[in-house]
Amino acid sequence: MLHTLTAAEREPKLFFWKFGIAFFGSVIAWAGPTQLLLGLQMIELRPDSKEESLALLMMLGGATAVVSSLITGYAADRSWFWVNRWGKRLPWVLLAAPLVTVGLFLMSFTPSFWVLTGLWCLVQVFVAFVTNNLMTVTADVVPQEKFGLVSGIVGATYTFGIVGGTA
């Protein structure tokens, strides 16, 4: 049987700061590669077909992100095995975030377009686990009267993350 938490139990100290930093990081994880880094890698890996190669890579990554978003939402909604004070979605974020980092790191060293494409698609799966679950973790953790504050944090850190990812 699930225990319904009170408003005081649902709002951990410093949650809003941690949430903002985490969401900022999740945006930088895809904004930097998509807007700057992958294009530069195409110039190196496929100079004669860089535009077509980048388009293919982004299309495959985008399709992976769409499908992954559906799967990650489904998986998180059925995570009955680790419901705690921080909800059932935060553990997915904590598991996937390091995998995003490892995937991006490996992408920077790949000498092959197809390996890069595979890694980018894998990173998209992990980014979906991080971003989608961060977007919905508020339902588990934050009292309803603070949803507007969290929405403002998402808007600010999203914009700042895009700028930071391309700077």
PLM feature spans:
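Central cavity-lining transmembrane alpha-helices of secondary-active solute carriers
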Residues: 55-78
